[in-house]
Amino acid sequence: MGAVVLGKIHLRWCDECDLPILEQATCGICGGKTRQMKLTPPGDARPAFKSNIERIKSLVDSQFGEGCGAAIVPEGHIVLLNKAPDIDRMDEVIVDGTIVGAVRYELLAGEKFLLRPSGATAIAPLVRKSWVTIDPGAAKAVLERSASTLAVGILDCDGGIVPGDEVLVLDENRNPVSVGTSKMSASEMKGHKRGTAIKTRWTVIAEPRGSGKEADWKDVVKANNEVLTRRVDESKRFIHKVVSENDLPVAVSYSGGKDSLATLLLVLDAGIRPKLLFVDTGLEFEETKRNVAEVAREHTLELIVESAGDSFWRNLQHFGPPAKDFRWCCKTCKLGPATQLIQKHFPKGVLSFIGQRAYESQQRAEKSRVWRNPWTPNQLAASPIQKWTALHVWLYLMSKGARTNPLYEQGLERIGCFMCPATDLAELRRVKEISREYDRWQRFIEEHASEKGKPRAWLDYDLWRWKRLPKSVVDELGLGHEACLSMSAEQTDDAPLRFESTSGYNPCVEGLSMEGVFSKPLPMERVANMLGIIGSVTTSPDGNIAEVKSITVFRDGPVMIRAKDEEELRRKAAMLREIVFRAVECAGCGICTGRCPNGALHLDGLVTIDTAKCDHCGRCLGPCPAVRFKQDDLDI
């Protein structure tokens, strides 16, 4: 996967104090020079909590033998995690100013620890599993040319190695040479004299490393005091400026997460007493709701709550499971209640400070620091922490002694809806372990899979999180064409065709969109053909998806529409509905054929379009017996 650059990588390291330093070329404790850390972008490193560290140690021990985990992550050392782009999830593990390895979640195999050179050096004297020793000639080839390890050069190996294992390669004196992935089993390595046994990922060379001094997070805060003071002062100036320029009541949108907590504390530091706004989506963790109430009490702030109630569960019957590419839930559970809250309590407008950060996503990186949501025009939003990294946020919270949501210390990176489709599988597995709320969702998704004839993989890998499976996921799971087709298995339904939709600004992906659903599966060949009325149509290889002019239609009924403004969104929705009704309920009357100036419409029982003749003028749209609705019937 390509690098995701969302801003400058601010992480540096003081080797003398063995502490992470943000931005500064000198350490805030010893005054010594710091060095730039080379992280995978976006470089939004965060603290590893006790539960994270214990899971890392356990994983390393299970792969390489007892005691290796403690060697990788020594007691009393600062540990950071840096999320890197991957098919599902990968976190680089930073200890003593070096990346010792990465925890990667593989869809089929689960969590694996991928050693890096410094991690290999740390465990080499202790390794009892997943090791091979090679002869001097092989070691020279690996070190000098980064060559893979061939079977002919292997002297000995752990008898439990199977293809796909992460392996530490040692020389005859058991010094680390390289790390990589096994391509053979142990018996094949010993029995074969040709072929690649270990595909090299990294050769082991000396890397800069901290002194190994023990430290705690109070030391890190102290070492970064100057940069924290500078960041806080800038944010306070920004807050004062926005407040002075807008004669509006001030609020903080609070979610129970670290970023909104930091934003609240900055507003309080600026001497402003805001109202606290919380939208209860109906999908919140109990820990989050408790945190919201506790924070309001601790700071004696007026808490205004708007709840979506059971909106999510009611709308499931119409829209089916939400997905990364079909986020109807953002409209019904976030945007709707937020709009109601503002209209009810701030009819003349409100200035709302929001914990948005550029390092969270490309969309947020491109967003202004002050903005208006087109669907909540009474809300002026502003972010004091737009250019902060996660580590800036955490160090600020630590400096304030803030009580954060306990879910972070239980291993979650993000706090939101407990079954958010944007969640990666690794984190979703953790949610299932700790969340009582997830049981209801699991029951629904199992019943839905049974009713719709979904294959077992749809449940096992939570593939409900997509309407259109990414090629990387299809390839990783080894899903063939037939399996992909059955992910959206068509069901027969003789009931009348209906269309329901929810539209608005999508707070999850920052875009103007509508998610809708037709009440039964669609004949995609006819729908794709008729969509040619408005433009050139592209279809997926399996024929399950058709796209034209930012309109996406799925065989099993869902649709997604994107537009630059509300007027365009409504126009596209009305046009799509008319076209789909024509495709599904065509009576074969031929009325529309006479409207086409190019003779592109043909009647052979049902109307079809000759795409070679159609110039997408849309003149054929008009009175039609199949379209039994008016423009204002659209449920938007």
Which residues are covered by each model-predicted region?
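C-terminal accessory/binding modules appended to enzymatic or scaffolding proteins
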Residues: 139-156, 530-532, 556, 587-597, ...
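RNA-binding accessory domains that recognize and position tRNA/RNA substrates
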Residues: 2-253, 265-274, 281-284, 493-496, ...
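Nucleotide-activated chemistry modules centered on ATP-dependent adenylation/adenylyltransferase
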Residues: 2-32, 36, 139-142, 156-157, ...
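Short cysteine-rich clusters marking metal-coordination/redox-active sites
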Residues: 14-17, 27-30, 586, 593-596, ...
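Short linker/helix segments within small regulatory modules
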Residues: 19-25, 409-412, 602-617
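A broadly conserved sequence feature marking short terminus-proximal activation segments
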Residues: 1-8, 360, 364-388, 546-596
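Iron-sulfur cluster-binding cysteine motifs and their immediate structural context
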Residues: 32, 591-607, 619-635
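ATP/NTP-dependent adenylation/nucleotidyl-transfer catalytic domains that generate, transfer
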Residues: 2-91, 96-99, 103-107, 403-575
